[in-house]
């Protein structure tokens, strides 16, 4: 029915992409965890909750920048 059936397993290219983005994915998961803790803090978020949230946000930004820099370096190497 399908000309190119959807593979059941990730391709090597997909695995390589996941590996390249792994640190960003981990940072984003930590950010979601910090956001959940912040939003569910009783009776209100503490200074520690605020600090945890800021650190998680900053980590995501650092990892995004690092990922873009690695990508740009790889383009320069090809050119």
Where do the language-model regions lie?
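Alpha-helical initiation/capping and key positions within long helical/coiled-coil segments
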Residues: 17, 24, 31, 48, ...
């Amino acid at each position: 029915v399908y000309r190119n059936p959807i593979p059941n397993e990730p391709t090597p290219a997909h695995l390589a992409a996941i590996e390249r983005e792994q640190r960003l994915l981990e940072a984003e998961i930590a950010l979601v965890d910090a956001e959940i803790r912040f939003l569910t803090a009783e009776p209100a978020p503490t200074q520690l909750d605020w600090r945890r949230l800021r650190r998680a946000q900053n980590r995501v930004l650092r990892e995004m920048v690092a990922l873009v820099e690695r990508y740009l370096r790889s383009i320069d190497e090809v050119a």
